[in-house]
């Protein structure tokens, strides 16, 4: 395929030719760095430049049929399987405290680190997320932001390892997943 995929509108320069160009808007509203405003400001150019624009942002999805819904991120797990479970609960987090959800996640992890296994940047770093999920029956997942169309690898990685997510994120989680497998 002769295509280019860009994760930011301002980075959309190509080497020329007849490549089809696609834009993927991945960050939550709290971290988009003005991407949504920039896209709206240059909407005609965006629509002319890109074959499709993939996003979870409901505001952008209303602008044109070229905007297509997709989860904010994919899956970081390499070995999709329902693995045997030998441990009770984990949480993958970081020491970031930039948003309210970061604070909730961090405070919960620190308050419960003697009861659950806590992993993540600045806490107990792991080389891959499988280490913090594969052996665990449950994992606490708190998204960086909470709105209807936004969820990330935090919940998807649990499904990919057969781990039940204890989830704080989109209030419309039932529109995307069977909630019998989510707490």
Model segments located where?
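Nucleotide-sugar donor-binding catalytic core of glycosyltransferases
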Residues: 1-183
């Amino acid at each position: 395929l002769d295509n280019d995929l860009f994760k930011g509108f301002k980075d959309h320069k190509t080497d020329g030719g007849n490549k089809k160009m696609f834009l993927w808007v991945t960050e939550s509203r709290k971290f988009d760095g003005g991407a949504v405003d920039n896209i709206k400001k240059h909407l005609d150019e965006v629509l002319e430049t890109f074959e499709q624009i993939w996003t979870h942002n409901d505001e952008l999805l209303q602008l044109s049929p070229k905007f297509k819904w997709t989860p904010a991120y994919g899956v970081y797990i390499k070995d999709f399987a329902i693995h045997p479970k030998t441990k009770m609960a984990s949480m993958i987090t970081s020491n970031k405290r930039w948003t309210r959800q970061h604070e909730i996640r961090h405070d919960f992890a620190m308050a419960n680190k003697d009861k659950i296994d806590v992993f993540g940047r600045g806490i107990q770093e792991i080389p891959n997320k499988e280490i913090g999920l594969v052996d665990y029956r449950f994992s606490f997942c708190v998204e960086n932001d909470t709105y209807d169309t936004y969820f990330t690898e935090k919940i998807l990685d649990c499904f990919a390892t057969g781990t039940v997510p204890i989830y704080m994120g989109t209030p419309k989680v039932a529109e995307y997943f069977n909630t019998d497998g989510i707490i």
